Design a protein with these regions (language model features):
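A structural motif
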Residues: 2, 58-61, 88, 113
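Acidic (Asp/Glu)-rich catalytic clusters
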Residues: 18-30, 50-59, 79-84, 106-111, ...
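Conserved, mostly hydrophobic/aromatic
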Residues: 5, 18, 33, 52, ...
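N-terminal binding-site loop/beta-alpha segment at the start of enzyme catalytic domains
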Residues: 1-31
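Beta/alpha (TIM)-barrel catalytic core signal, keyed to glycine-rich beta->alpha loops juxtaposed to Asp/Glu
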Residues: 68-171
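Active-site groove signature of glycoside hydrolases
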Residues: 53-74
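Short, acidic/polar
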Residues: 1, 41-57, 98-108
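A short, structured active-site edge motif that brings together acidic residues
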Residues: 29-41, 62-68
C-alpha cells in the first residue's frame, strides 16, 4: 500500500487531521509526509512551515514543496537551510496545471530539487515534452497530481466492460 501523504496548508484541516491520525495510530514512522509552502516572504514562509510541522505533529517533515512557484527563490533558500539542519528531508516544487510546466522546467533546469510535482494524465501529457525528461536527467523524483483528472477519466469508462487482458492484473 501507499505510505505517502501529500498535504498543504491550503487543504483546510488536512494537516491537523493527518497529524492526529498518525499520532493516534502510532504510524508516523511508517508514513512519508509531504506538505507545501504557499505564501509570500521569508518570515511568512517560515511561520507557515513551522505551523505545518506542529499540525502534522512531527519534528521532521519528509518533503516540503514550494507550491505553484509562489516566491520560490525565497523559499528555496529557507528550505536548503532547513534540510542542512535536518528539519526536512527533501525539497520540492510544484505547479498543478499544464500551463505552468515551462516555467517549472526552467526552474528545475537551473536549480537542484529532490522532487517536482505536476499534472500528468493520459489526456494531459504536456509533461512528456520537457519536464519529465529533465527530471529524469537531473535525478529529480516526480509526483503526479490529478492522474485521473479528478475522476473524469473513470466517469468516461463507467459501465464499460474491461478488456480480457485486465484479468492478468486481477482487475
Amino acid at each position: 500500500g501507499g505510505s505517502m501523504i501529500d498535504s498543504s496548508p491550503m487543504y483546510g484541516t488536512a494537516e491537523a487531521v493527518t497529524g492526529d491520525m498518525l499520532a493516534e495510530l502510532g504510524m508516523r514512522d511508517k508514513a512519508f509526509i509531504a506538505t507545501k509552502v504557499w505564501t509570500e516572504g521569508r518570515r511568512d514562509g517560515i511561520e507557515q512551515m513551522a505551523k505545518s510541522a506542529r499540525l502534522l505533529r512531527t519534528a521532521k517533515i519528509d518533503l516540503i514543496q514550494i507550491h505553484n512557484l509562489v516566491d520560490w527563490r525565497t523559499h528555496l533558500k529557507t528550505l536548503r537551510r532547513m534540510k542542512e539542519e535536518g528539519t526536512i528531508r527533501y525539497i520540492g516544487i510544484t505547479h498543478y496545471t499544464d500551463w505552468g510546466q515551462a516555467e517549472l522546467a526552467a526552474i528545475i533546469g537551473a536549480n537542484q530539487f529532490d522532487f517536482v510535482q505536476t499534472e500528468y494524465a493520459i489526456d494531459t501529457r504536456k509533461a512528456e515534452e520537457r519536464l519529465l525528461p529533465l527530471a529524469r536527467d537531473k535525478g529529480t523524483a516526480v509526483i503526479i497530481n490529478r492522474p485521473f483528472q479528478r475522476g473524469s477519466l473513470f466517469r468516461a469508462v463507467r459501465g464499460q466492460k474491461l478488456p480480457p487482458w485486465a484479468a492478468d492484473f486481477q482487475c
